[in-house]
Amino acid sequence: MPEGPSVRKFHHLVSPFVGQKVVKTGGSSKKLHPAAFQSLWLQDAQVHGKKLFLRFDPDEEMEPLNSSPQPIQGMWQKEAVDRELALGPSAQEPSAGPSGSGEPVPSRSAETYNLGKIPSADAQRWLEVRFGLFGSIWVNDFSRAKKANKKGDWRDPVPRLVLHFSGGGFLVFYNCQMSWSPPPVIEPTCDILSEKFHRGQALEALSQAQPVCYTLLDQRYFSGLGNIIKNEALYRARIHPLSLGSCLSSSSREALVDHVVEFSKDWLRDKFQGKERHTQIYQKEQCPSGHQVMKETFGPPDGLQRLTWWCPQCQPQLSSKGPQNLPSS
């Protein structure tokens, strides 16, 4: 699924539509009927990690809400490119279970909300958007087929939801799951792209006696971090993905957190500048030093298994005898 930098970009694309009324709807969503948005006003947009939250109200009145993400060294002053390419056919990764997911905590029971029905008139209408593997948002345009499918047909991706607004523009949502939800309670201290990201909390999590590649994907401590960031940060910190956090020196754990934040911010900045993502190990056959890259699926016994790329020479596996320093990058 799209990682933190991509969802931040989606938030930036949606934000100009806040304060506008939905005048026409469309899309293929069956659990949440597109017609439910007719005549509603988009009043707020919030992002946390890999999730986007949109608030809709039946009237034009707006409450002052601090919904914008923390600016990252002025990059929000740059104009976003209005298109996010949707790659390939619709596909979604399995979502992690509630244990250890670290998702925003609802402020009241979600049982009062229904996937396909709008909440009662006195309830805030918060739409929770979870993007699939090729999830995207397009502005004032539709995604087009880049290649033929397995049957040889050139079929354009089918949008899950299309919202036309009173200002004349429209938003198109692809490959995502949507549901009405209670108002989100956002915790920026675990968001890797927030200026309030809590390094101490992250370092403490990384000191656990479990493979660091498991801990990095725990959204309770690294919200917004996905498989690409995991692989890149581990390689740049020269840490083997199965190294136990308790066996790493404090300086190695600090270097890993540094690379997580640095790569995430650089990736987001590249998105806003229309540049290609630059990876060193993810989906590579050789590392930058010319060594053969290994690929294997790792994950907790009862959790999601994820493809992992690493270089055995640049990222040697440690013994479990105690904290060890790793080769510097």
Curated annotation (Swiss-Prot):
Q: Which UniProt keywords apply?
A: Acetylation, DNA damage, DNA repair, DNA-binding, Glycosidase, Hydrolase, Lyase, Metal-binding, Multifunctional enzyme, Nucleus, Phosphoprotein, Zinc, Zinc-finger
Main location as per UniProt: nucleus
Q: Which of this chain's residues are annotated to bind DNA?
A: N227
The cross-references to SMART domains, in alphabetical order and at most eight, read: H2TH
Which EC numbers does the record give?
A: 3.2.2.-, 4.2.99.18
SUPFAM superfamilies in the cross-refs = S13-like H2TH domain
Q: Relay the activity regulation note.
A: Acetylation of Lys-50 leads to loss of DNA nicking activity.
- Which parts of the sequence are annotated with region: Disordered? 88-112
For whether the record's keyword set contains Iron, the answer is no
Known catalytic reactions: 2'-deoxyribonucleotide-(2'-deoxyribose 5'-phosphate)-2'-deoxyribonucleotide-DNA = a 3'-end 2'-deoxyribonucleotide-(2,3-dehydro-2,3-deoxyribose 5'-phosphate)-DNA + a 5'-end 5'-phospho-2'-deoxyribonucleoside-DNA + H(+)
List cellular component terms (GO).
Answer: cytoplasm; microtubule cytoskeleton; mitotic spindle; nucleoplasm
Which domain of life, per UniProt?
A: Eukaryota
What ranges of residues constitute the FPG-type zinc fingers?
280-316
The active site lies at P2, E3, K50, R306
- List of residues that carry N6-acetyllysine: K50, K150
Q: Can you name one GO molecular function term for this protein?
A: damaged DNA binding
Q: Where in the cell is it found?
A: Nucleus
Which positions does the record annotate as the modified residue Phosphoserine?
S68
Tell me, what is an example of a GO biological process annotation in this record? base-excision repair
**Keyword Methyltransferase applies:** no
UniProt note: domains: The zinc-finger domain is important for DNA binding.
Subunit field text: Binds EP300.
UniProt family annotation? Belongs to the FPG family.
What role does it play? Involved in base excision repair of DNA damaged by oxidation or by mutagenic agents. Has DNA glycosylase activity towards 5-hydroxyuracil and other oxidized derivatives of cytosine with a preference for mismatched double-stranded DNA (DNA bubbles). Has low or no DNA glycosylase activity towards thymine glycol, 2-hydroxyadenine, hypoxanthine and 8-oxoguanine. Has AP (apurinic/apyrimidinic) lyase activity and introduces nicks in the DNA strand. Cleaves the DNA backbone by beta-delta elimination to generate a single-strand break at the site of the removed base with both 3'- and 5'-phosphates.
Listed name of the protein: Endonuclease 8-like 2
Starting at the broadest rank, the lineage of the source organism is: Eukaryota, Metazoa, Chordata, Craniata, Vertebrata
